[in-house]
């Protein structure tokens, strides 16, 4: 155990990285999970808050992903799976609004590339100085695209001042532009980008040094190559040593990297081995040293009715706590509950760090009072799909949220009805999804998103 932190030390100990000065961002980003972002009849999504604006608060542009809700061949909603990172859902684009207001003009940033073709977009992040936006794109995709075949996921960057869009890694100089997949980019304070990738640069270099054939390690399910964390320069190069950038080593996926105020990288790791199958939070220095479990290895039985949940999409809030999404792997309509984790004092929900041994927990609390269920079926409080803490001193969170609705199949044609207690007691209530994107105040756990404008799916 790490004596200072009371965490499990999983790597070579080094001097902890100091937090570089982080510039105030002039741009805030919301990555709206596409499957939960409802489109209106006109194809638009409302991002708004009906509360009066605070004259002391500066409003910033927002970027978000918008796509159609994916359907199976039988017309039912297709369920995502946290363990599958390579699959794509066509019909997505990256959009910009000058403010989080229904009157703000919506601009399609990626239309210059997608041009109506079948592309997918995800994992949006902004640079610390608020001048650039980075995200993952895949396309153009065939109607019955084999996820194992190219085109693959690539990382793109949008420069706001010049209104230019480009692939961060130049395909012409990429040694393997067709089969490797790069997702989940996040800016480091020095301008470099940490991302999840199937490149496995150092792993394959070790195989080469040992005289063994180079191959991409598959995850334990053998469904797709393992995604691990690597770091590249701002221009998409990897420096003189092409094997240096690999930050993490895992037999399954490392995803959703972000940077803490102390300069360390925090991410969600899929630990999958005999007798173990969970996604917990890990951290390390930006060079991969001093790897440690950050939170949650023994806190997965904290879902609805003490069911299993995974911890994904961690982001640090201005007060130092961690905002994360807890949800099951699949069959939960692409969403779950937002929780706030006190990672500064706890390593598990009821286990404090060594320096805080008198604390009893809980370490994690719901971000809102919504009655959100993390099990399959209707959720009275709706479900959250993604969240972005606004670093503007207002303690707000921009979220992608789907309201609880039911499909009454006793009517002809079937009708959408509210999730009332009576309707929920009906035999086999069927959820119908509706999404809202809005800013929520968590000062007193009273979500302002209840008054947001909503768009029907």
Name every feature range the model reports, one short phrase each.
Residues 45-46, 101-119, 159-179, 232-252, ...:
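Multi-bladed beta-propeller domains
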Residues 65-89, 136-154, 195-225, 267-280, ...:
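Short, conserved, GDST-rich strand-edge loop motifs in beta-rich repeat architectures
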Residues 268, 312-443:
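Loop/turn-rich, solvent-exposed surfaces of beta-rich toroidal or solenoidal domains
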Residues 93-95, 154-156, 227-230, 280-282, ...:
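A short loop-to-beta-strand structural motif that recurs across blades of beta-propeller domains
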Residues 58, 90, 120-122, 129, ...:
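Beta-rich catalytic cores
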Residues 149-231, 239-255:
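Asp-box/WD-like beta-propeller blade repeats and closely related beta-sheet repeat scaffolds
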Residues 59-60, 129-131, 190-192, 262-264, ...:
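Short coil/turn segments that connect the beta-strands within blades of beta-propeller domains
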Residues 32-57:
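Bacterial Sec-dependent N-terminal signal peptides
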